[in-house]
């Protein structure tokens, strides 16, 4: 038992991603009928999702010019949907349904990555003026954001009431959250705005555009049925 605790403490990211994968697989198993897939395929999808998610956050960090060991959670926000689009086309599944089911899995994966930030001491908030050694709890605030989002979205996804809107709602909310919280995050810049503010705005715009398109499509389909 002691050896297990030591290994977990030495490799927190691997342990957290393993936990995230297990939770993701459980969710996919519960909703696999929505994806019309077998139980073993749901397991493979959960594992593949984590691996692709890790590659996404590392690739985006590389694009931003960070070092090889860095991660940027915007990578998951921007790159993972491309995987959903590809998977939906290859396996001939409705894209909205695929995105709805996998959005909580993505959120859990990013949550695990942010917990790793706390354990590894990176991505800290700015020092709070007048309070010696205490920083703004930006990472902890992000974890609360994820939890609230999951609490609000998962029941609706479970009941099939999101209609493909789970992902755009997530990226809109995340864009707003990150834009605000970045003012309190410690960055290697003296300017008020920095790169993450830009990506937050991009995230918000993507979410709005997708949400609007889904709403337009629904209205068009309803008009067609009423004729």
Model regions: which residues?
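Hydrophobic, membrane-interfacing alpha helices
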Residues: 1-227
């Amino acid at each position: 038992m002691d050896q297990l605790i030591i290994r977990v403490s030495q490799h927190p990211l691997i342990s957290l991603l393993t936990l995230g994968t297990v939770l993701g697989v459980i969710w996919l198993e519960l909703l696999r009928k929505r994806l019309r897939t077998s139980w073993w395929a749901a397991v493979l999808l959960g594992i593949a999702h984590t691996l692709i998610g890790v590659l996404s956050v590392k690739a985006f960090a590389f694009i931003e010019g960070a070092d090889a060991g860095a991660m940027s959670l915007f990578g998951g926000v921007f790159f993972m949907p491309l995987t959903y689009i590809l998977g939906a086309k290859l396996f001939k599944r409705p894209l909205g349904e695929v995105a709805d089911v996998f959005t909580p899995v993505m959120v859990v994966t990013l949550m695990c990555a942010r917990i790793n930030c706390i354990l590894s001491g990176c991505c800290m908030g700015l020092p709070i003026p007048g309070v010696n050694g205490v920083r703004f709890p930006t990472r902890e605030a992000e974890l609360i954001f994820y939890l609230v989002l999951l609490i609000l979205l998962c029941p609706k996804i479970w009941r099939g009431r999101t209609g493909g809107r789970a992902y755009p709602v997530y990226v809109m909310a995340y864009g707003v959250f990150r834009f605000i919280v970045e003012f309190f995050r410690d960055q290697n810049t003296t300017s008020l705005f920095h790169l993450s503010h830009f990506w937050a705005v991009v995230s918000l715009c993507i979410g709005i555009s997708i949400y609007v398109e889904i709403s337009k499509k629904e209205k068009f389909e309803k008009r067609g049925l009423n004729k």
